[in-house]
């Protein structure tokens, strides 16, 4: 299931410069009686974990955990690329899993607040420093029902083995279904500080600091290159016997989707690959990374002509006849950006279109008749279980494919001269 949506033309990454389910929720969340929280202190960052409902019903089907939908507040601040643009146009392009008319209608209904005040002006132009809240019906994506295994815990550190399928922290349609969300809801753990990140479908060693001093120390040593980071991945093809070093710079392809590519004006990146074994079709490879760019191993393995097996994003013909080997895409940067964007639109995951819903949304967006906005005092328990403008409530989604949950990429070991944390080799990496 792709956590992506359409991006307007002026939202695309700049060209390289040439420089180097609908079911009743029987239990109300513990905070369901709370009214909308404003940004009382403009400088205080609101921890989304603190606002998570603690008792959202869920069910497990075929080893997959499905969470019931619930109401939640999305908070953000104006990004540089948003300044001077209409708020509803920005959100239509960047909000995930929504109908193209949703932002305009939500604004009319009074579900969006700017700087603590209800904003119903669909022509509002975003300014630097704007603080935005959006109350919406959240349908979290399903995850595998797997435990988060504790590797080590001290007064300063909490180290776990992250299972595949869930992000580390709140993002997009994930909140409770994140590592931090599950640790809070299931174990009551709070105050953990993320020391590094792993992609949603990646598994392996994940470190948290339990206090500010440890957080600062670890991030300082990380910047100084004192960490040794070892990964294991399974790639397509027979990988060369000799060590392969990739130092291609990496930068964004489609910003709002987080999709990266090799580009001359990207950030420096360095990865070392060494084959462990091959079955003649695929290879298991050990990787040491000296930098930590977004999707670095996935992008570098693609560049080497051996993309990670089953990678829905980077192991695809949309990148060209050789799937992006040597960054030879056989198309312009704009064409690549557009093709990749269209491949991962949320609409591609709908079971079938809902013409009635589409027509209703078109009508509500175009209708100039004033709408009485929702009362700012509206509580969560007063909100409906079915939302008439929520796309997930109105459009059936396809079954999530297995390769969405797991990427054949595992963080095996993180260490410095002072400490070392390691997991067992994943089953798929063990030679039979």
Swiss-Prot record:
Domain S4 RNA-binding, first and last residues per copy: 85-148
InterPro entries for this protein: PsdUridine_synth_cat_dom_sf (IPR020103), PsdUridine_synth_RluA-like_CS (IPR006224), PsdUridine_synth_RluC/D (IPR006225), PsdUridine_synth_RsuA/RluA (IPR006145), RluA_PseudoU_synthase (IPR050188)
Disordered: region residues: 1-42
GO MF entries: pseudouridine synthase activity; RNA binding
Name of the molecule in the record: Uncharacterized protein K07E8.7
Residues annotated as catalytic: 199
NCBIfam families in the record: rluA_subfam
Keyword Cytoplasm belongs to the record: no
Gene3D superfamilies on file: Pseudouridine synthase (3.30.2350.10)
Organism: Caenorhabditis elegans
Tree of life domain: Eukaryota
Polar residues: compositionally biased ranges: 1-14
UniProt record similarity statement: Belongs to the pseudouridine synthase RluA family.
Pfam families: PseudoU_synth_2 (PF00849)
Any Gene Ontology biological process: enzyme-directed rRNA pseudouridine synthesis
Basic and acidic residues bias locations: 18-30
Record keywords: RNA-binding
The keyword RNA-binding appears for this protein: yes
